[in-house]
Swiss-Prot record:
This is Endogenous retrovirus group K member 25 Pro protein. Residues 21-96 form the Peptidase A2 domain. The gene is ERVK-25. The active site is at D26. It catalyses: Processing at the authentic HIV-1 PR recognition site and release of the mature p17 matrix and the p24 capsid protein, as a result of the cleavage of the -SQNY-|-PIVQ- cleavage site. GO terms for molecular function: aspartic-type endopeptidase activity; nucleic acid binding. Keywords: Aspartyl protease, Autocatalytic cleavage, ERV, Hydrolase, Protease, Transposable element.
Amino acid sequence: WASQVSENRPVCKAIIQGKQFEGLVDTGADVSIIALNQWPKNWPKQKAVTGLVGVGTASEVYQSTEILHCLGPDNQESTVQPMITSIPLNLWGRDLLQQWGAEITMPAPLYSPTSQKIMTKMGYIPGKGLGKNEDGIKIPVEAKINQKREGIGYPF
C-alpha cells in the first residue's frame, strides 16, 4: 500500500478479527482508535484507564478487553488493543503502523538543483511537458545500452 500526500486523506483498510475497517493513517497517534459507532456490539470493551489527547473532547473512552488479531492493508500480520470513542473515522496509530512496517519517504529529486534552475530559466514549468504547447513527455527518457553496437554512432 502506498499513498502520495495530496488533498485526500491517507486512508487504508485493515481486517480486525475478520471484520474490515477503513481508517486514517495517523503517524501522530500513539494508539489506534476505532469509532464507537463501528465497534461491533458483541465485541467486549471496558472503560479506558487513560484518556485520549488530541481527538477533541471524548467523554466516553473505552478500550478493547482483548488483544485482537489484525491484517494490514497488504496482509501484514499484527495485533492491536484499540481504544474506542466517538470519532468520525477510525485512526491507525503507530501501534499498528510500526507492525505493518510503515515508512514515510521523501524521494530525492530527479534532477540536481542546478539543472532545475537552468530548466526554469528556459521556461520549463514543473509538471508540464516540454515543447511549444507544453504537451511533450513529462517523465525522463530512460537511457538504454546498445549491446549490439549498431546504429547511430557506430561504424557499419
